[in-house]
Amino acid sequence: MKIPNRQKFTKNHKRNLITKETRKTGLVLGNYGIKATETGYLKMKQMERIKGDLVKKLKDNMDIYFNFYPLFGLTNKGTARMGAGKGEVSEWYVLVKKGSIVVEFIKSRMTAGAMQKVIRYSANKWPIKVRMTQIKQGLYEKKI
């Protein structure tokens, strides 16, 4: 994954974990998706591991679209005396809110049962709880 090239402020305060997503709650591009059921942080290493596992399991059966991008920097000061500043950005993370669609699967050539197995396998790698969502003929979203 890429890191942000340029930001106005790279050293941010930590975000509020109580909020709930109101905008990205439905599937837009694909038939299947992974929805977050709790709020939490995803670090860049965790994102890479999840992406690699999904690509390995799905192979060429469908395209994967990730709805997140690491925008916030996590700083690490190290060992220094007081008053030396905040520290440099050591890694990047993204805030995933409860109810947001995190991953969408496009052009699916798999059944719902096979897709559930893949998502259950990858759900163990996530630092937050996730579940699978499915859209039926573009009309409504079904919880699985």
Curated annotation (Swiss-Prot):
It comes from the Eukaryota. CDD domains: Ribosomal_L16_L10e. It is found in: Mitochondrion. Gene3D superfamilies: Ribosomal protein L10e/L16. InterPro entries: Ribosomal_uL16, Ribosomal_uL16_bact-type, Ribosomal_uL16_CS, Ribosomal_uL16_dom, Ribosomal_uL16_sf. Keywords: Mitochondrion, Ribonucleoprotein, Ribosomal protein. Pfam families: Ribosomal_L16. One of its GO terms (cellular component) is mitochondrial large ribosomal subunit. One of its GO terms (biological process) is mitochondrial translation. GO terms for molecular function: rRNA binding; structural constituent of ribosome. Belongs to the universal ribosomal protein uL16 family. This is Large ribosomal subunit protein uL16m. It comes from Dictyostelium discoideum (Social amoeba). The lineage of its organism: Eukaryota, Amoebozoa, Evosea, Eumycetozoa, Dictyostelia.
